[in-house]
Amino acid sequence: MSAQLGELGLTFGQRSVDGKSNEIPAVQALLKELDISGCMIVADALNCQKETARITIEGGGNYLLSVKDNQPTLKSDLEDYVQDLALRKNMDTETTIEKNRERIETRTAYVSEDVSWIPDKGSWENLSCFGAVHTQFVTFEKKTDEWHYYISSCPLTAKELLHHARTEWTVEAMHWLLDTHFSEDYCRVEDMTVQRNLNILRKCAINLIKQFKQKSSSKRPISNIMFDCLLDCSMLLTVTSCNY
């Protein structure tokens, strides 16, 4: 389980998940270890927990939590509110349209700071707003829709919600990079300590290459840069020393 800097997709902290437990206590322990003052903590639905919200606020940060079926009552309440057209028209709204290869992605965010009606609002530390993101994917063959709901301790605009919600996807992107470039899903190492160490080294390598790409404004794929580092020691030195 990792903590990432959303804007850059860089991993700056991680913690192992106990085999007899789950990710929730690991996330809470990691939040206590990190300096999160002034940070917006974006977490997936599994970590939409009241204790996680409390720890975040006590650490000086703010939270944006995705609300799904593990919080069924809260999700149902938010869904009923947002799907009421009369209520939705009074929410702050922002829409973006992007073309991704042969797919057009339209995202519309809705945000309201009126949390007075939420029955359990007192249980969520510093709850200040809620929102939803409606995503529509259009291809030549079909059109699909998705709704995602959020709560936050920080008063957000719809534009800010779209920005922060996108950072949640960087975690999935990192998993994809690790599997694509290091075949992590096919790793058969059984020793847990070795697994953790290899995972750290892989993420360090990805971090270094991302930093190099950012500082050099390189558009080259990560795989090409990795291959160059393998063949050229001077390139390897350039990439690994780009932060110094």
Residue ranges, per PLM feature:
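Conserved, well-structured functional cores that handle cations and Mg-NTP chemistry
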Residues: 1-43, 48-51, 217-221
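Short, conserved catalytic/metal-binding motifs centered on acidic residues
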Residues: 9, 27, 40-48, 63, ...
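Electropositive phosphate-/nucleotide-binding environments in soluble metabolic enzymes
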Residues: 21-24, 144, 195-202
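Phosphate- and divalent-cation-binding pockets in alpha/beta enzyme and binding domains
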Residues: 51-52, 73
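Short, surface-exposed basic-aromatic patches at helix termini and helix-loop junctions that form
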Residues: 53-61, 83
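An anionic, glycine-rich sequence signature occurring as long contiguous blocks
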Residues: 68-166
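A short, flexible helix-boundary coil/loop motif
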Residues: 91, 178-244
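Short amphipathic alpha-helical "interface-anchor" segments enriched in bulky aromatics
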Residues: 151, 155-189
